[in-house]
Amino acid sequence: MRTIAILAAILLVALQAQAESLQERADEATTQKQSGEDNQDLAISFAGNGLSALRTSGSQARATCYCRTGRCATRESLSGVCEISGRLYRLCCR
């Protein structure tokens, strides 16, 4: 009888751990979905050769930057941070 109670307790703990893992994944998926929406909130374009971070040899540089909550996209590089409504985001430029 004692063995059955111990096995039942172990089973309940395992099920609870699995449920927490599923909840974490669901929360993470929701966060990623929301950050995907946030990624397109602000686009900044720079043109000209006066910006030292965007200088090229003798030609006008052009960059498009996005304030992102997650990682920068494939062809973008991290160029700093930006602040919107008191929240900090990554400034990703290409």
Swiss-Prot record:
Entry-linked Pfam families: Defensin_1 (PF00323), Defensin_propep (PF00879)
Disulfide cysteine pairs (residue numbers): C65-C93, C67-C82, C72-C92
Tell me the impact of changing R71H.
Impairs antimicrobial activity against S.aureus
Which key words are in the record? Answer: Antibiotic, Antimicrobial, Cytoplasmic vesicle, Defensin, Disulfide bond, Fungicide, Glycoprotein, Immunity, Innate immunity, Secreted, Signal
Tell me the outcome of changing C92S: Prohibits tetramer formation
Q: Which SUPFAM superfamilies match?
A: Defensin-like
Q: Which GO terms describe its molecular function?
A: protein homodimerization activity
What does the annotation give as the result of altering T69R?
Enhanced antibacterial activity against both E.coli and S.aureus. Enhanced membrane binding and membrane disintegration abilities, as well as further increased antibacterial activity
Signal sequence coordinates: 1-19
Briefly state the modifications made to the protein after translation: Glycosylated.
Q: What does the record say about tissue specificity? A: Expressed in the gastrointestinal, reproductive, and urinary tracts (at protein level). Expressed in Paneth cells of the small intestine (at protein level). Expressed throughout the urothelium of the lower urinary tract and in the collecting tubules of the kidney (at protein level). Expressed in stratified squamous epithelial cells of the female genital tract epithelia, such as in vagina, ectocervix, endocervix, endometrium, and fallopian tube (at protein level).
| Protein's UniProt keywords contain Disulfide bond | yes
> Impact of altering L91A?
Reduced interaction with B.antracis lef/lethal factor and decreased bactericidal activity against E.coli and S.aureus. Reduced enhancement of S.flexneri infection
Q: What is its main location?
A: secreted
Q: Which GO terms describe its biological process?
A: antibacterial humoral response; antimicrobial humoral immune response mediated by antimicrobial peptide; cellular response to lipopolysaccharide; defense response to fungus; defense response to Gram-negative bacterium; defense response to Gram-positive bacterium; disruption of plasma membrane integrity in another organism; innate immune response
The induction annotation reads: Up-regulated in fallopian tubes upon infection. Increased expression in kidneys with pyelonephritis.
**Keyword Signal part of the UniProt annotation:** yes
What GO terms fall under cellular component here? extracellular region; extracellular space; Golgi lumen; intracellular membrane-bounded organelle; midbody; secretory granule; secretory granule lumen; transport vesicle
Q: Where in the cell is it found?
A: Secreted; Cytoplasmic vesicle, Secretory vesicle
Question: Which function does this protein serve?
Answer: Host-defense peptide that maintains sterility in the urogenital system. Has antimicrobial activity against a wide range of bacteria, including Gram-negative E.coli, P.aeruginosa and S.typhimurium, and Gram-positive E.aerogenes, S.aureus, B.cereus, E.faecium and L.monocytogenes. Confers resistance to intestinal infection by S.typhimurium. Exhibits antimicrobial activity against enteric commensal bacteria such as B.adolescentis, L.acidophilus, B.breve, L.fermentum, B.longum and S.thermophilus. Binds to bacterial membranes and causes membrane disintegration.
What assembly does the database describe for this protein? Answer: Homodimer. Homotetramer. Interacts with B.antracis lef/lethal factor.
**Which family does the record assign?**
Belongs to the alpha-defensin family.
Protein's name in the database: Defensin alpha 5
Q: Organism, per UniProt?
A: Homo sapiens (Human)
